[in-house]
Amino acid sequence: MILIYGPAGSGKSTQGRLLAEKLGRTWLSAGQLIRDSHRFDEYTSKGAMIPENILVDLLWENMKAVFDRDGEVVFDGQPGSVEQVGMLEKCGVFKHTEFVVLLKVPEEELLKRLATRGREDDNIEVWKQKITYFEQKSYSFLIEMKRRGVKICEVDGVGSVEEVNERIMKLIQKN
């Protein structure tokens, strides 16, 4: 599994989908699973964080189906916290993890992208909450992943979809 990680607006789903297509893997997106399920609309419409145990259940039920089939996954979004890492590790997720691609995008660029994407839960307060949440959780998440032996590879997420994807593909070829 290759995990694509970054804040809201960094291009996780765009790059995850494209990468899965190029590598012939299954694409799973935490954000898309959440939006498609509609079980979490009360949280997402306000920018509130979904309780971690509920979120992990949703992620695991979808990941397990892919791992049981072939295990070749590009996953974007979560886990977003140390607590989620621990819960997912109990499910055996990280024995499948090759490395994490961390998309680095400045906040001004994130806000510019978010303003043009057109999702119904998009508004500036929700975006700022999501960016703040990522900033608060990402450092400890990345430290925990490194502690567990998972390689973290930073990629400049600024540029066209094709430019960013080319950077990621070069990184994959090196690893």
Label each region the model flagged.
Residues M1-N175:
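Glycine-rich phosphate-binding loop of ATP-dependent small-molecule kinases
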